[in-house]
Amino acid sequence: MDPECSRLLPALCAVLADPRQLVADDTCLEKLLDWFKTVTEAESSLQLLQDHPCLMELLSHVLKPQDVSPRVLSFALRLVGVFAAQEDCFEYLQQGELLLGLFGESGAPGWAAWSIPSVRSGWIQGLCYLAHHPSALHFLADSGAVDTLFSLQGDPSLFVASAASQLLVHILALSMQGGAPGSPVPEAAAWPMCAQKIVNHVDESLHAKATPQVTQALNVLTTTFGRCHNPWTGVLWERLSPPVARLFERDPIPAVHALMDLLLSVARSPVLNFAACGLWEMLAQTLSRLSPIQAGPLALGTLKLQHCPQELRTQAFGVLLQPLACILKATTQAPGPPGLLDGTVGSLLTVDILLASKSACVGLLCQTLAHLEELQMLPQCPSPWPQVHLLQAALTILHLCDGSADPSSSAGGRLCGTLGGCVRVQRAALDFLGTLSQGTSPLELVLEVFAVLLKTLESPESSPMVLKKAFQATLRWLQNPHKTPSSSDLSSDALLFLGELFPILQKRLCSPCWEVRDSALEFLTHLIRHWGGQADFREALRSSEVPTLALQLLQDPESYVRASAVGAAGQLSSQGLQAAPASPENSQAQQGLLMDLMHILSTDSEGFPRRAVLRVFTDWLRDGHADVVRDTEWFVATVLQAVSRDLDWEVRVQGLELARVFLTQALGQPSLHCPYTVGLPRASSPRPHPEFLQTLCRLPLFEFAFCALLDCDRPVAQKACDLLLFLRDKTVPCSSPREAGDSPNSASVEAALQRWREGEQAQPLGDLDPEAMLAILRALDLEGLQGRLAKSSDHVEKSPQSLLQDMLATVGVLEENEADCY
């Protein structure tokens, strides 16, 4: 331990033991405990207690809980556990009966402060820290602590109850350690005392009539099989699987969700022989006994298993498909997917749930659609995948939601009334519909998909969220439609669809709802990014009013919409699709957009549009946009001037990224779009051209990055440091580095560095020649600064000495004015 910390420790222990002192808040105590953990990892806990008697005095004082505050009680219980984690220190503490006085049945559980959850939680955590060696196991078995943990499983505090269950699993695993590798696992009756006690308690709880007790037992088993992958878990399952199986004989089945979690946890175990232990039969029985809404998560979990019999996979997949099969049967004359609706009890139960109430119907359909959507993206996705039937079901659900379905039965009519206008189901169906775009579908169904999407996008009844989902699904079907994988062009059917879509998109761009305008702009941006270079798409877009409306939204009153409009305008301009009159004014219109974006960057009151402008400008610079190439120096200078005054740190970071792109093009590998590298050889020269260094001195780039080194926002300073390191590596010769004072303009260099060191980084550097700029780059310890910036912002104040000093400094502060120094 640090000598200064040793000097401060007695005073701090005295303060903690004094209930009249309102010491620190919980955060400081947590940091103090973390520090003690670090110390005990490097030193002997026993030696630490012997060298610092004040610690033993504090811990002994806790045996009089009426004289200690609850938060200090909780801290002390955990601290004792940290010390007792080392076996020699455990025995030392046990001799003085400190451990029994704190963790025994007559200890903390008998205190008045035991009613406070944080004290109970501290007691559990203290036990968890010390339970790391055989001596601790004997103590736990003899002290009554395990019995207290059993009662805490039902604690009203969920955190305490969960911690108690986790600790029981930890104790069980610790008890079973120590067997010789390869030796046979003894029967459960021959297990250590602690292990037997826990297993017997779990067994009794599984036979209990009260559901909470059953749930507690199942949770312990689930955690055990999830964490412990040793052979003894097979003996444990052999012992407890019969009472688990008998839970299915009850009506209703208790703790269904906990029971499903257990079965899946056991099924993932790498050490069990599933065929021998009857797990597959138990899973099959469970799938058939549960209601459709209960069986869905278990069916999905079963299908995710690596080694699962095909028969069980088929059963689980059938459970997931059944609700959609019922939808198809209720709305069409076709029987739906073969073999899924055969008059079984399961299918009748599904129909009953779909028709029982709106909440039950909506819940089952949303769960089913989400599970199937997740399943399609997994490697364990069933094959063959019933693409056609699932697509028909998704479209049918959307028809039911918009009221256009033509039911063939009374059940279908009731479904129309239940699902009509249901936004939640519409959203789930559109998500699933988008996922189905990855499969191969017949042309007539693809055309129906486009028709349903058009209707949804056009309907005045569609909510903003439904429209957003419809735009996303539309994009996915356009990106991956029924075409050859090598083709990136839009199909003729997709182009016809776009011809009908653009008038609808025009209306949505004029929507009074800002969320709709925003979604429409995002959709347009994606469209242009993917197909802006295709002639047919360009013609269809130009023949609409969409580009004009998108540019008008640069003046939208909502900042999110302005930001999306900036992105759309940037894409339109990059592809030469911006709205403009005939050719004479085309160049002026293009320049007009550039100035509009510059105006937004300089004057917009919200950060989102300004950030969007910087992203567009960075892309334009990287891609060699015509307006940027026309006068790159003016462009970069104007942008950086505006960015240097911006109060938004994300704008400043993006400005530094733009500067990095500029330097990379000019100093890095030559680029086709870089005006400074035209005609240069492919290999980079060891020193940049003097004219470019003069350009750098004229630009505010170096000054902007130099001042940003001490930006109050760390990401900005880090980005600036990286930029200057890149600039130095590309410009300063590797050999014969010169000091700042060797520069021809050493006075100005020293003055600039002095101002920077004194914190006047906002002051302009003044006129610098290239040699002065290079001298500053040589003089700065950029690597050291980069290392300091990589540390957390409180790395100086996080020292243990600072922590102890601050905790002592807070003594006497009123509780309502407590301050966390960290």
Curated annotation (Swiss-Prot):
High levels detected in the cortex and much lower levels detected in the cerebellum, spinal cord and lung (at protein level). Ubiquitinated by NEDD4, NEDD4L and ITCH; mono- and polyubiquitinated forms are detected. GO terms for biological process: apoptotic process; cell migration; cell population proliferation; DNA damage response; glucose metabolic process; integrator complex assembly; mitochondrion localization; positive regulation of cell growth. GO terms for cellular component: cytoplasm; cytosol; nucleoplasm; nucleus. Its main location: nucleus. One of its GO terms (molecular function) is ribonuclease inhibitor activity. Coiled coil: none annotated. Transmembrane segments: none annotated. It comes from the Eukaryota. InterPro entries: ARM-like (IPR011989), ARM-type_fold (IPR016024), BRAT1 (IPR038904), HEAT (IPR000357). The keyword Transferase does not apply. Residues 100-200 are annotated as: Required for interaction with NDFIP1. Keywords: Cytoplasm, DNA damage, Metal-binding, Nucleus, Phosphoprotein, Repeat, Ubl conjugation, Zinc. The modification Phosphoserine is found at S743. A motif (BRAT1-like motif) lies at residues 820-822. Zn(2+) binds at C821. It is found in: Nucleus; Cytoplasm. HEAT repeats lie at residues 495-531, 544-576. The BRAT1-like motif mediates inhibition of the endonuclease activity of INTS11 by forming hyrogen bond and hydrophobic interactions with the active site of INTS11: Cys-821 coordinates one of the two active site zinc ions of INTS11. PANTHER family: BRCA1-ASSOCIATED ATM ACTIVATOR 1. Part of the multiprotein complex composed of BRAT1, WDR73, as well as integrator complex subunits INTS9 and INTS11. Interacts with BRCA1 and ATM. Interacts with MTOR and RPTOR. Interacts with NDFIP1. Interacts with SMC1A and PRKDC. Belongs to the BRAT1 family. Component of a multiprotein complex required for the assembly of the RNA endonuclease module of the integrator complex. Associates with INTS9 and INTS11 in the cytoplasm and blocks the active site of INTS11 to inhibit the endonuclease activity of INTS11 before formation of the full integrator complex. Following dissociation of WDR73 of the complex, BRAT1 facilitates the nuclear import of the INTS9-INTS11 heterodimer. In the nucleus, INTS4 is integrated to the INTS9-INTS11 heterodimer and BRAT1 is released from the mature RNA endonuclease module by inositol hexakisphosphate (InsP6). This is Integrator complex assembly factor BRAT1. The gene is Brat1.
